Regions:
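A glycine- and small-residue-enriched flexible loop/hinge signal that marks low-structured segments
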Residues: 148, 218-295
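Extended assembly-interface regions of large multimeric machines
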Residues: 1-111, 158
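Phosphate-interacting basic helix/loop segments used at nucleotide- and nucleic-acid interfaces
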Residues: 70, 151, 212
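Extended, beta-strand-rich, solvent-exposed assembly scaffolds of outer structural proteins
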Residues: 48-57, 106-184, 226, 231, ...
C-alpha cells in the first residue's frame, strides 16, 4: 500500500486565493471546528494565522491548523488569502452572549463601575439588582459579582481571558437555549450591546453533516475545500466522515473534502475493509481526499 499523504502536502493543493476566472470564486479553505468560540450559524473569515491565534488563542487547535494552512507549501510564491471557520457542534450547545473586549480597562476603572443589567435567556427576562464592582479583585471575580446580582439567574457569567470579554452562557442546551444582548445602565461600559461589538450564539442541537453543509453554502460558497479540525467520529468508525463525503459527492465536484483519518488498519491489513479509504472506494464517492494523522 502506498504511504499516506501528510498534512503538509494537503496545504500545497490549496495554495490560497487564486481567481477561478469570471466573478470571483476564491480557493479558500473552510475549517470546521468543534469548539464553541465561533458563534453558531456564522462563518468567520481570517486573513492570517496571527488573526486566528488572536481570536481562538495561541495554543488552540484552530491556531495550530491555521499556522500550517497559511504557511503554504515549501517555496510557494502564492499564499492563502483567507481561512474560513465555522462551528460544527458535535453535541447540543448552549446559547451565549460574549461581550466585546474590556481588557483595556484597568482594574481600578472596572472597580469604578456600577449599574444594572437586563438580559433575556431562554425566553425569560432577568433584571439585576445594582451591580457594584468596587470590591472586584479581578475580572473573573467581577463576573462572579455580576452573576450574584441576579436573583435565580438561568445563566452563568464568566470572564474569557482570550477575548478579554464577559460571557453570559445559558444553563440549557439545544434549540430552546436562547439569549439576547444586554441592556441596562451598565451594558455599555461592559461592552455587552450589539453596538459595542458583542456577539450572540444561539443554542443548537447536535449538527448533522449534510444539513450542516447545506446551511453553510447558504451563508457563503466562497471556498473550495473543507476539513475538520477534529475527527468527527472521535476515533470510532467512519459514520460521520462518510456522511460528509456523501454530501460532497452530490455537489458536482465543486468542493474537496479533506478527511482527517486516524485509522491505522490499512497499514497492517490489506484490504482493511472497515477503513474509510476502502469504504469510499467501494461506493465510488468523488471529491474526498484522505489525510492520515496518528491518533
Amino acid at each position: 500500500m502506498t504511504k499516506s499523504i501528510p498534512a503538509s502536502y494537503f496545504v500545497s493543493i490549496v495554495p490560497g486565493v487564486i481567481s477561478a476566472g469570471g466573478s470571483a470564486l476564491d480557493l479558500n479553505g473552510l475549517m470546521l471546528t468543534n469548539g464553541t468560540r465561533t458563534p453558531i450559524g456564522s462563518v468567520l473569515s481570517f486573513a492570517s494565522a496571527a488573526a486566528v491565534a488572536t481570536y481562538y488563542g495561541a495554543s488552540s487547535t484552530e491556531a495550530t491548523a491555521a499556522a500550517v494552512y497559511f504557511a503554504g507549501f515549501d517555496n510557494s510564491n502564492v499564499k492563502p488569502g483567507a481561512l474560513l471557520v465555522a462551528q460544527y457542534n458535535t453535541a447540543n450547545v448552549a446559547a451565549y452572549l460574549r461581550g466585546a473586549s474590556v481588557s483595556s480597562l484597568t482594574l481600578a476603572q472596572l472597580q469604578a463601575l456600577t449599574g444594572t443589567l437586563i438580559i433575556t435567556t431562554d425566553g425569560t427576562q432577568k433584571t439585576s439588582g445594582t451591580i457594584t464592582l468596587s470590591g472586584a479583585t479581578s475580572f473573573s471575580n467581577a463576573a462572579t459579582i455580576i452573576q450574584a446580582a441576579f436573583t435565580t439567574p438561568n445563566f452563568t457569567v464568566s470572564y474569557d481571558s482570550v477575548s478579554g470579554a464577559f460571557v453570559f452562557t445559558s444553563n440549557t442546551t439545544g434549540a430552546s437555549s436562547t439569549i439576547t444582548y444586554c441592556t441596562g445602565t451598565l451594558a455599555d461600559a461592559l461592552n455587552l450591546r450589539l453596538a459595542d461589538g458583542a456577539v450572540t450564539s444561539q443554542g443548537a442541537v447536535t449538527a448533522v453533516p449534510g444539513t450542516f453543509m447545506t446551511a453553510i453554502t447558504g451563508i457563503t460558497q466562497d471556498w473550495a475545500s473543507f476539513f475538520t479540525s477534529f475527527d468527527p467520529d472521535n476515533g470510532s468508525g467512519n459514520t460521520l466522515k462518510l456522511a460528509f463525503a456523501n454530501w460532497n459527492n452530490t455537489q458536482g465536484n465543486r468542493y474537496a473534502y479533506i478527511a482527517w483519518d486516524t485509522d491505522a488498519s490499512p497499514t497492517t491489513t490489506v484490504p482493511a475493509t472497515t477503513s474509510l479509504g476502502y469504504l469510499l472506494s467501494q461506493s465510488s464517492v468523488s471529491g474526498t481526499s484522505l489525510i492520515y494523522a496518528p491518533a
